[in-house]
Regions:
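Glycine-rich, highly charged phosphate/nucleotide-binding loops
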Residues: 51-67
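ADP-ribose/adenylate-binding Rossmann-like module
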Residues: 71-75, 82-108
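An accessory alpha-helical subdomain
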Residues: 126-201
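Structural motif
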Residues: 14, 70-71
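Hydrophobic beta-strand scaffold residues
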Residues: 38, 56, 95-96
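Residue-level detector of alpha-helix initiation sites
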Residues: 21-23, 80, 126
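Hydrophobic, well-ordered beta-alpha structural blocks that scaffold small-molecule cofactor pockets
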Residues: 1-44, 49-51
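E1/E1-like adenylate-forming module used to activate ubiquitin-like modifiers
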Residues: 98-147
Length: 201
């Protein structure tokens, strides 16, 4: 099965994590930087999870826990509970990730690389996590060795360039030249942008 890489705004979205151990912790660590509203349901929740901004509910899973949730992470060590949650989510059209059970996943977690405004998600569709990890390290190394302000600078002058260029072909040339300067660590201001526009017109 191939997975389409949607990038979704999950800020303040209600995400339910069922399970309170290290597996659940790893998922919460990945989700937290994107500021969702996370509820953790488990009879026992590890201390590391409680350090995150989560709502902790220390009891067994209840079917009503699914009310109003955007997606579910099923991370218990009980296969019967995981299967029950998966079937309920399928009935209610709720996205569910059953940890370590690809057949019971409506979505999967990619290996994530984050650097300033750049987010890269890498997946082998669940076939080889170790290869995904290797690729993650390669991308991270590449980003570490480029100007970290490139995306922000291009965004800063995006509207200005669109307003001051006559056509799409010219815009592409200007953005390409600007990006090359950013990657070389050169200082950018309006005068520099105007010069690039003039040189490519």
């Amino acid at each position: 099965m191939a997975y389409f890489p949607f990038y979704i705004d999950i800020e303040n979205k209600n995400i339910l994590v069922v399970g309170g151990g290290t597996v659940a912790l790893r998922k919460i660590e990945k989700l937290s930087p994107f500021k969702p509203s996370i509820t953790v349901v488990s009879p026992k929740i590890c201390e590391e999870i409680l350090k995150f901004n989560v709502k902790a509910v220390e009891r067994e899973f209840d079917d009503n826990d699914l009310n109003g949730v955007f997606c579910v992470i099923s991370a218990t060590d009980n296969e019967q509970v995981n299967s029950h949650i998966f079937e309920l989510c399928k009935e209610k059209n709720i996205l569910v990730n059953t940890v370590d059970d690809k057949e019971k996943c409506g979505f999967i977690f990619p290996a994530l690389v984050q650097k300033n405004s750049v987010t890269v998600g890498i997946t082998t569709s669940g076939k080889s996590p170790i290869y995904a990890k290797y690729l993650k390290e390669q991308f991270l190394n590449m980003l570490e060795n480029t100007n970290s302000d490139t995306a922000e600078t291009l965004w800063q002058y995006r509207e200005y360039i669109k307003k001051n260029t006559a056509d799409e072909e010219l815009r592409k040339k200007v953005f390409s030249a600007l990006m090359s300067m950013c990657l070389c660590g050169e200082s950018i201001d309006v005068d520099v942008v105007n010069k690039i526009i003039k040189e490519n017109s």
